[in-house]
């Protein structure tokens, strides 16, 4: 999220972990404005079911912008059922080329339980390496912790929960109130 356009707004850590045929997406619940926590129980991870194909989306950035993107993604998935990569690429193209969408301040992590994609307003659709992806203010902390925890015998959900707890201990814009969704 751009500090230039939304000075003082901070928040969100979203993490996706794939292991042993399962994908877990976890997001914290904190929304901050400047030095003030405005809400500690926001739900930034959503389960969608367009055309009978389950998808989990986590978002960081402006909530209104993220919901606009979620609606667009759902339409793309309905137009291309079961084709997550195609839907994400089509969304990224629209996001990059449309004058209105271009100004939206959000990032998404999207999974169907097999593939994980990070979708950005710069037109990027990235598949993570090492079966872990993270976005948001505490994203780098969660990513580093999860990558280290992937060396253990922990399952995907335990890796995600522990990595998010580590991120919440380090990032002042991340809390330990998690929303966790599992596919697979």
Curated annotation (Swiss-Prot):
Which terms are listed as keywords in the entry? Answer: Allosteric enzyme, Cytoplasm, Hydrolase, Metal-binding, Protease, Sodium, Threonine protease
> Is the Hydrolase keyword given for this protein?
yes
Q: What is any Pfam family matched here? A: Proteasome
EC id: 3.4.25.2
Record the organism.
Paracoccus denitrificans (strain Pd 1222)
Per its record, the protein catalyses: ATP-dependent cleavage of peptide bonds with broad specificity
**Family, per entry:** Belongs to the peptidase T1B family. HslV subfamily.
The gene that this protein is the product of is hslV
Q: Where does Na(+) bind?
A: 168, 171, 174
Instruction: State the name under which the record lists this protein.
Output: ATP-dependent protease subunit HslV
- What GO biological process terms are annotated to this protein in UniProt? proteolysis involved in protein catabolic process
């Amino acid at each position: 999220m751009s500090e230039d356009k939304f000075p003082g707004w901070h928040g969100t850590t979203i993490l996706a972990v794939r292991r042993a045929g399962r994908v877990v997406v976890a997001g914290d619940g904190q929304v901050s404005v400047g030095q003030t926590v405005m809400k500690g129980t926001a739900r930034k991870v959503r389960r969608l079911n367009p055309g009978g194909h389950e998808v989990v989306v986590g978002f960081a950035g402006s909530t209104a912008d993220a919901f606009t993107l979620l609606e667009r993604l759902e339409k793309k998935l309905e137009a291309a059922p079961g084709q997550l990569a195609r839907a994400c690429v089509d969304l990224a193209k629209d996001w990059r080329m449309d004058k209105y969408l271009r100004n939206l301040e959000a990032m998404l992590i999207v999974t169907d339980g097999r593939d994980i994609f990070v979708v950005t307003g710069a037109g990027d659709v990235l598949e993570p390496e090492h079966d872990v992806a993270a976005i948001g203010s505490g994203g780098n902390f969660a990513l580093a912790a999860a990558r280290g925890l992937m060396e253990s015998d922990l399952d995907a959900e335990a890796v995600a929960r522990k990595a998010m707890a580590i991120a919440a201990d380090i990032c002042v814009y991340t809390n330990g109130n998690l929303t966790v969704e599992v596919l697979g």
